[in-house]
């Protein structure tokens, strides 16, 4: 969005989201916590806005990486904490998508990591409003792990090192793709600890859009959700909603 357009002025954009968190204080995981976190989000509907065609101004949820759920999808990931994952928005055009993936692979491998798997995130494309559907990107989940020959650190050291590398990789990818002007590209998250599901949705649409979130084998112990404050900024499908810092 331009710095100034009509009555809109970017100088007045700021975060004032409705946020919530659900935690199992005993550390246990369950799908019930996913359901409860989504209920918290849905109860913040008054914090957001939507158009006549039911296009929302953004909503999202951040949870721990559901390691067991990922294994059940047949994805051969390493041990918990020894790989990173994240949801990525990609353009639907195959040529642009391949260009972005090549850049991602280059930057991932620069840090001794490898893109080990690319998963199509199951979504219900009938859920978002008309305007959101018109700009909907391809939604993928990437899995990144250290190259086997370089994975020699202890589990604790590797987790800290991997998280730092994933942050650097994400920033380098974003810097390289930004000048290309590809609006439909966005990395929702890239971490060895947490994963973010978000988009240009209402708080009530998130659950129905991302089918992972209603899978009974998707278990978490902590969930944080966000619903932007009405009229605080102009929404875009790529960015969706803002979210709190990473969960502990």
Which role does the model predict for each range below?
Residues 1-247:
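N-terminal segments that mediate ammonia production and transfer
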């Amino acid at each position: 969005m331009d710095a100034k357009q009509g009555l809109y002025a970017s100088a007045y954009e700021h975060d004032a989201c409705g946020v919530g968190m659900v935690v199992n204080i005993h550390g246990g995981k369950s799908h019930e916590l996913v359901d409860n976190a989504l209920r918290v989000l849905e109860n913040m509907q008054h914090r957001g806005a939507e158009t006549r065609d039911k296009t929302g101004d953004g909503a999202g949820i951040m949870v721990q990486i559901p390691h067991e759920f990922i294994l059940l999808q047949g994805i051969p990931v390493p041990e918990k904490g020894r790989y990173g994952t994240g949801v990525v928005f990609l353009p639907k055009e195959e040529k642009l998508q391949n260009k972005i993936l090549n850049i991602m692979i280059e930057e991932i491998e620069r840090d001794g990591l490898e893109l080990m798997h690319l998963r199509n995130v199951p979504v219900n494309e009938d859920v978002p409003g008309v305007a959101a559907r018109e700009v909907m990107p391809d939604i993928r989940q990437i899995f990144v792990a250290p190259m086997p020959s370089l994975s020699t650190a202890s589990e604790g050291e590797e987790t800290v090192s991997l998280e730092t590398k994933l942050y650097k990789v994400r920033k380098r990818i974003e810097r390289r793709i930004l000048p290309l002007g590809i609006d439909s590209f966005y990395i929702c998250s890239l971490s060895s600890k947490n994963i973010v599901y978000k988009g240009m949705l209402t708080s009530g649409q998130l659950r129905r859009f991302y089918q992972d979130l209603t899978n009974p084998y998707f278990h978490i112990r902590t969930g944080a959700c966000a619903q932007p404050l009405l009229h605080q900024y102009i929404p875009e499908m790529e960015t969706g909603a803002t979210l709190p810092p990473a969960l502990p």
